Design a protein with these regions (language model features):
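Pyridoxal 5′-phosphate
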Residues: 1-384
Length: 384
């Protein structure tokens, strides 16, 4: 069997931690918590419901949110759809204006384009030269009819940060709602929704060493009653998301978020050192440049532009698992919309790589990656 390449695509997805798998197995099979959590007439349902609510508490503890403010979804894409379309469809105040940016994930961009087709007016903020959305730019975009502002906390392609707390204060003072996509932030940044002016926040398990197919949406007090369900049929999750709850996946998300909280400080320091070694080694190579702000970013993700004649990122695939764009766009050969928004040319965007580190990245992996990339960057261009 051909050996798999070294994994440097943690921003696309993370492997499920073995400790998380163990908790999920407790919910499968005849001896597990296999009951329907909505069945309150017997112990099977009670046990499953208790497991679900324990997981809800675990997620809430990581992000500083009351357990009852969290709605289970199938992932951050559904959470984003529920937040954006749910708020828009519930609006009866004549507010038809939404503010977002060109840097957002496709789950946000495409949802907003759909709302635009339905008659909503969308203001698309442009990033500054460092690839950041500044609070002042948001303030300037706010209007009397602004309903919602939606921005990501950590950019999935660049690893850059948005000051959502400062922006949220401005949005709240204006009387609009603030939604944040935090799929790339959990376990990496401190999030305390008790003290953040955020009304809606989207989460994903599979970006945090949990299973795919499960996520959550935080619905703050200001957003309650201002959200229309997108999936109907049973009134589950306070009427906001119908469907039988997947106990094993939910328990996996709770376990993953609990582990992320317990290990965040140590893991951030460890990955910071590994990332610095990788970054310094690569930026010393000819023609290699960092895309996005060098300071306001998480250590886990690097986006590098390699401007060398003949460099072909596809040649790396047998040795390194990296991305040239978001995983949701990888089937397309078009350049990254995020990199184009930064002002890069299509050729520059196509010569860029996203390298993302994670829990199972070892120091020796960094050294091997440096060897592979140095060889690829310095290789002479092909003559045919």
């Amino acid at each position: 069997m051909t050996a798999l390449p070294l994994y440097f695509d943690y921003a696309a997805t993370t492997p499920v931690d073995d400790r998380v798998i163990a908790t999920m197995l407790e919910c499968l099979g005849r001896q597990g918590h296999f009951g329907n959590p909505a069945s309150g007439s017997h112990g099977y349902g009670d046990n499953a419901r208790q497991a679900v609510e324990r997981a809800r508490q675990q997620v809430g503890e990581l992000v500083g949110a009351p357990a009852e403010s969290l709605v289970w979804t199938s992932g951050a894409t559904e959470s984003n759809n529920l937040a954006l379309k749910g708020v828009a469809q519930a609006s009866d105040m004549g507010r038809r204006h939404i503010v977002s940016s060109r840097l957002e994930h496709k789950a946000v961009l495409d949802s907003l384009l759909e709302l635009q087709r339905q008659g909503f007016d969308i203001t698309w903020l442009e990033p500054d030269a460092a690839g950041l959305i500044q609070p002042e730019a948001v303030s300037q975009a706010l209007r009397a009819d602004t309903l919602l502002v939606s921005l990501m906390m950590v950019n999935n392609e660049l690893g850059t940060l948005t000051d959502v707390a400062s922006i949220g204060q401005r949005v709240r003072a204006h009387g609009a709602l603030m939604h944040v996509d935090a799929a790339q932030a959990t376990g990496k940044l401190n999030i305390d929704l008790r003290h953040m002016p955020i009304d809606l926040m989207s989460f994903s398990a599979h970006k945090t060493y949990g299973p795919k197919g499960i996520g959550a949406l935080y619905v703050g007090e200001r957003a309650r009653g201002a959200l229309h369900a997108q999936i109907h049929g049973g009134g589950h999750e306070q009427g906001l998301r119908s469907g039988t709850l997947a106990t094993h996946q939910i328990v996996g998300m709770g376990s993953a978020f609990a582990l992320a909280g317990a290990e965040q400080a140590a893991e951030t320091a460890r990955l910071g050192a590994l990332s610095m070694r990788l970054r310094e080694g690569l930026l010393n190579l000819p023609g290699v440049h960092l895309n996005g702000c060098a300071t306001h970013r998480i250590a886990h993700t690097l986006n590098l532009r390699i401007e060398r004649p003949g460099f072909n990122a596809a040649q790396l695939s047998s040795r390194l698992a990296v991305s040239s764009t978001s995983a949701c766009n990888s089937a397309s050969t078009a350049p990254s919309h995020v990199l184009l928004a930064l002002g890069l040319s299509p050729a520059q965007a196509l010569s860029s790589l996203r390298i993302s580190l994670g829990r199972f990245t070892r120091p020796e992996d960094i050294e091997q990656a440096l060897e592979v990339l140095e060889s690829a960057v310095k290789a002479p261009p092909a003559l045919w």
